[in-house]
Amino acid sequence: MEALWACWVTLRQWGLTNSPNPLFKNPKTRIQLKPEVQWELDQAETITTDRLAHAFETRTRWYQTINNAFGQYDFLALPSAQVFPFDVAQHWPTEIEERQMTTYHHWMEVVIGGTLSGCPVISLPAGFDDQHRPMGIQFIAPIGEDKKLLEFALAYEEALPWQDAYAQIGK
């Protein structure tokens, strides 16, 4: 997972450096961006061609790995988050199960597999914890199987009584 994480961070930051967004390029507006975005932009400036090439190689290997999995499975399923919703005053979780989150977005690591695969992904409700906080499950389908994934999602939602659960949120 660490290789995928490094790949995703590199490609994300590289994408920011190629953004036409004038807020990123203008020092007067860049300073007004939140510190996490400024950090991303600063990190992006350190990306070497070797690091970028390695990220693309990692993504290619991941694409091949996930594509091979679809030889055995119609869909892949993962949690849609590593933590339940947290207090709005908290910027982000800094630790999950005694594992330090190294960046402001590391707590979302579980979604990068689907993102990097290029496959269609959908997140659906999975249930609630004892504090009525929702959790989801992400389903990943093979490339080109968007319709199949949407049909599955519809059947999933029709088969489970989520409407009743949603009505209980906040009670």
Q: PLM features: residue spans?
A:
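Short, surface-exposed loop/helix-turn segments at secondary-structure junctions
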Residues: H54, F86-W107
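Tryptophan-centric aromatic hotspots in well-structured domains and transmembrane helices
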Residues: W39, Y63, W92, W107-V110
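Structural helix-boundary/capping segments
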Residues: A53, Q64, Q72, T115-K171
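Short glycine/threonine-rich loop-to-helix capping motif typified by GTGT followed
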Residues: E2-W14, F86-P93
